């Protein structure tokens, strides 16, 4: 284990009140929970840097990692993690949503601004198709079971990026698209 990895893990453990736990045990547990598959020390360090930067807890899945195709990682922040970093921002002054079957608009209010930051996300641009197994079987995901909730999450995350300048972190859907390296083109609506 590298010194940088031990230092970052210790800093994170201290922040979440786990500094009395053996650092090696913490790192072992994190390797098993915050990564899909094996992780190198470099990938692990990258995740811990982002977790510490945004004050996110990888033990509670506020942040975890998807390995990319170039042996790096894509830092994935869960909805609870996004909610934490939004609510902990000192300038945050509330948010609201307007939603119908086609779109969701999120407004985030900042204490230091006169006007809210508004973002609209569209169902036809964000929705994902069911996953297909190698055998061709369809597996439905959250976009099929809870499409409006997923769209609301997308609108909140994109609005938070504009309102607070969050960069280098992604939601699970974005991470999957990055790793798949696929672009999605929405169908034109009449």
Annotated model-derived regions:
Residues 1-190:
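Glycine-rich anion-binding surface patch
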């Amino acid at each position: 284990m590298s010194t940088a990895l031990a230092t970052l893990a210790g800093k994170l453990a201290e922040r979440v009140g786990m500094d009395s736990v053996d650092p090696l045990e913490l790192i072992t547990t994190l390797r098993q929970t915050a990564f899909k598959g094996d992780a190198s020390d470099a990938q692990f360090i990258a995740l811990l840097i982002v977790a510490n930067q945004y004050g996110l807890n990888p033990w509670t899945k506020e942040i975890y990692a998807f390995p990319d195709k170039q042996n790096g990682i894509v830092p994935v922040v869960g909805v609870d993690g996004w909610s934490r970093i939004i609510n902990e921002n000192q300038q945050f002054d509330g948010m609201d949503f307007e939603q119908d079957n086609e779109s969701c608009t999120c407004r985030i209010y900042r204490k230091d601004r006169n006007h809210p930051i508004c973002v609209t996300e569209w169902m036809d641009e964000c929705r994902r198709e069911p996953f297909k197994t190698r055998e061709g079987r369809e597996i439905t995901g959250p976009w099929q079971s809870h499409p409006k909730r997923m769209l609301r999450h997308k609108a909140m995350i994109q609005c938070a990026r504009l309102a607070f300048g969050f960069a280098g972190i992604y939601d699970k859907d974005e991470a999957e698209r990055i790793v798949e390296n696929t672009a999605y083109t929405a169908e034109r609506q009449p």
